[in-house]
Amino acid sequence: MKQERPRIIVTADPELDDNNSLIRFLLYSSDLNIEGLIYASSQFHWSGDGKGTKWFVPGREYNRFGLNLCPCESWRWAKNERFIHDVVEAYAKVYPNLKVHNPNYPAPNVLQSKIRFGNIEFDGDISKNSPGSALIKSLILDDKPGPLFITAWGGQSTIARALKSIQEQYEFSTEWEAIKKKIARKVVLLPSGDQDDTYATYIKPNWPMIEYRQFRDGPNYAYGAQLGAKPENAPYLTASWMKENVLDRGPLGALYRTWGDGKQMVKGDIMDYFGLAGYTNEELKKMGYVVWMPVQPKGAWLGEGDNHTFMNMTGNGLRAYERGFYGGWGGREIGSGNGMDFSLSTSQDTSANAMAMSLSTLNNQLNKTGKNAPYPNFFPQAQHDFSARLKWSVTPKYTDANHEPTVKIEGPLTILASAGEKIRVNGAVSDPDGNAVSINWWQFQVGTYPGKVMISTPNSAQTEVIIPNDAVGGQTIHLILEATDNGTPSLTRYQRMIIMVRNK
């Protein structure tokens, strides 16, 4: 089955976990139609205009923690910042290997042509166009079919400026109503919080119909993931796992950031002590660093806090990008398309636990108090997949690496069934490497039917599902066929069937 490749734009600031997320993201470029790789600013990173202009927004980190460092000309932005260029150049070095394992990887020059600088000068400034905002504007207005997914790994000012320039051009024209409807149908925003307040102050008031997907329940890919990791996830966050599966794997692995690696995104950054090894929290504080997360072992997981914005886009068969509530390796939607607002700027709690809490961590905590069904733990599968793709990047021969199994549910993937009915479903699995493949049918409780369904033989390719007698017409049941091979690392793929209950 041919996998749809969602159109996606990444906007990112030079936070070190954005760097890490970008490495993983490009390893999934085979599954995606990447339309933009855009430098963005945020409250945590902005370049200044190079003209001596000073900037200040009350309540930001430069005036918390007892600091009084701004107004200032720039904040935590390296001169000649090029982390996106660096990762794409590393991708170019390994592209010949990657395309051996999946021919859909885009050529490096295609990715390089998508790089732009957005509204990077000042935190939250949407007063003028930038190359990045111009690219986003053109993509929003084009006539290509399907949704356009726009991530915000940093602030949303570049996205806001693109929308504002559309508003300024068309607001008083006869085309305005049609353009607003088109954009509402087309654009899906995928934020890592509102890191410069431009969603709250401009996008939401002026474009309330744009879908705004925020996720909960998914794997915690953020800073401090190891602090509360489940026992089954903890091994994938250790220094030994990171070294073997990430750091020692070629040019992309070499750019990946871990604790105590000797690197710093911006020289002299008092917030970034992650590259220093051999110091205690108290020693780092005496050295002038703002220690907002406890020191971890050298080489351990540092963070990929923006993964939740794109991990549902991957071609693993869950089709989680089709609807926010479908759920996948990035989590499931918090609520409605215009769900809760979450701003990283609102918390004045500077404790390690509070400061390390990403949107994904917050979402996990929110769900513990809710009535929703438990969410599957996808972290091991996601880490295995990441490891396998990094292995591809350094492996020129197809037979020297593992590849994901193929899984297919025969017939339509959306069917009708009546309450009390027994339906037979047939799956087929295979493996390109000749590995053994284990099968598991399971109910993904993201449908509107709240109860459990009975699956007769969950570990066979063919099985029967009994629709419960209390199912009501119009309710949905999501059934997953999961296939995992026994290669190294083991890789998992899925297919999702949606059963719609007939009206009686």
Regions found by a protein language model. Name each.
Residues 473-479:
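Exposed beta-strand face motif in extracellular beta-rich ectodomains
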Residues 484-490:
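Short, solvent-exposed loop/turn segments at the edges of extracellular beta-sandwich modules
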Residues 1-451, 474:
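N-terminal acidic, glycine/proline-rich low-complexity segments
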Residues 443-466:
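Surface-exposed, flexible coil segments in extracellular/virion-facing regions
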Residues 500-504:
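Extracellular interdomain linker/stem segments of modular secreted and single-pass surface proteins
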Residues 490-497:
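Extracellular and select intracellular beta-sandwich modules with Ser/Thr-enriched
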Residues 466-473, 486:
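Short, surface-exposed loop/turn segments at beta-strand-coil junctions that are enriched for proline
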